[in-house]
Amino acid sequence: MLAGVHDLFTEQDRLAINTTMAAGSQTQFDALLVEQPRPSVGKRLIPLIGLVLLAIVIGLILVAMIGGLGLIGLVILVVASVFLARMIARWWHIRSLRNASRLKVIGGYAESRGWQTVDQIALPATTPLLRSGDRRKTGWGVQGTLGEQVHFCAGEYIFETRETSSDGNGNTTESWQQHPFTVAVIGATLEGIGSMRIQKGKTDGIWSKLTGMVTSLQPVPLESQEFNSSFQLLVSDDADQIAVRERFTPVIQVAFVDRGLGTSQFEAENGVLVAARKGSPQTDNFGALMDVLADAVWMRTVFTNKPAGRLPDIAALRALLLGPNA
């Protein structure tokens, strides 16, 4: 996100929350390492079996090729694979403990806010992004309410596309391509607008016009040429144009230009608003997940504020997002 007076969650906020969580997760990690000093049996056996089998296969090939010297190579490979398996098991164990410690600290923060952490966030297929691909899945995240009535969830969302390829003999191979996102989903009814999409681009550009031809969304050029050149704003074909312009007043257009979208994109449909960025959320960068949630909160306010067209109250929204002591 670009720094500006309309930022709800700043770079300083992200660094502060990440620093606090890093300190807490290190304490948790030290405690977990005392409780679980050695990798589990599974973590030790999986790399050991895999590497030893690979070493044996390579060693047998060497024996077949160079005889007795290959046998010596086989022994060396097996011994090396045992040591390598131990290193991998240790790395796997440490990585798992660090991830667990980070999630524990995130869980503590979420609990202090009245939220909860989940292994899989619940996402209904309410917007085009959440319906994309041939199959979809979710990962870890947080969910709860902001204030009394604003329900949200934020975390990992992945849609997968099936890809097939054929060789010269007509044999077909199928593979799956993953498209991971960090998303924040929040309730929002866009009165008079219905559904919308806004992302980096040009509202009056060729891609916006093509999108309007093949989807139920149409581009809406506004008064600010700088806005139109920076953002692609699409709304329902049957949207009330007056309602759109009541929301996107000149002062709101200036706020968009000042604030920027960073790498976020937004969709709203069926009473839900989605803020999304490419890439999965990381447990060692919880601030980035909070940043996406902040984007969703700010955008929701633009579309639901009453009276329409006023600038979001940043101080009030920061208290909503970060708590009364923000």
Language-model features and meaning:
Residues 42-52:
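Select subsegments of transmembrane alpha-helices in polytopic membrane proteins
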Residues 73, 91, 95, 281-284, ...:
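Residue-level detector of alpha-helix boundaries and kinks
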